[in-house]
Regions:
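A structural signal for small-residue-enriched, beta-sheet-centric alpha/beta enzyme cores
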Residues: 1-142
Length: 142
């Protein structure tokens, strides 16, 4: 993705509000800094990039028994995790993609409640995606 996983201070993750404990180092955002944040990086970051040149790929795996259409919905919802962790995201230079796979070992409710349960899976997927992106960067070693 063209965007950054860090706030402008270079050490606070965009996904910090979704962290559990100190998994991302415990760095907290400065509210005054948040008010002054520019959403797009400077122009030099975009020079000569072709569409899809900065692709972020992810996968959501669930044990819930989902249809292909439901997997697609969960993957769509998980894109919120990209937006929570990377700023900006889904620019014309990005080819961001998320897949969802269903292990099919756990039945979820049929009928009207199924939609709610599917929403819960997608929302949890988005939270996990945000945390996974930030943790991947935080835990990476060069």
């Amino acid at each position: 993705s063209v965007g950054s996983v860090y706030m402008p201070d270079g050490k606070t993750f965009w996904a910090q509000p979704f962290a559990i404990g100190d998994e991302l180092g415990g760095q907290k955002a400065n509210p005054q800094q948040m008010a002054a944040i520019q959403p797009m990086p400077d122009d030099s970051k975009f020079g000569g990039m072709s569409p899809g040149a900065n692709t972020t790929i992810g996968i959501i795996a669930t044990s819930a028994k989902l249809t292909p259409a439901e997997c697609k919905r969960v993957a769509m919802m998980a894109h919120d995790g990209f937006a929570r962790a990377i700023r900006p995201v889904h620019t014309p230079s990005d080819g961001d993609t998320i897949f969802c796979i269903s292990g099919g070992t756990k039945e979820i409710t049929d009928g009207p409640r199924r939609s709610r349960e599917l929403g819960e899976i997608g929302a949890a997927g988005a939270d996990c995606m945000a945390r996974a992106i930030a943790r991947g960067v935080y835990e990476a070693q060069s």
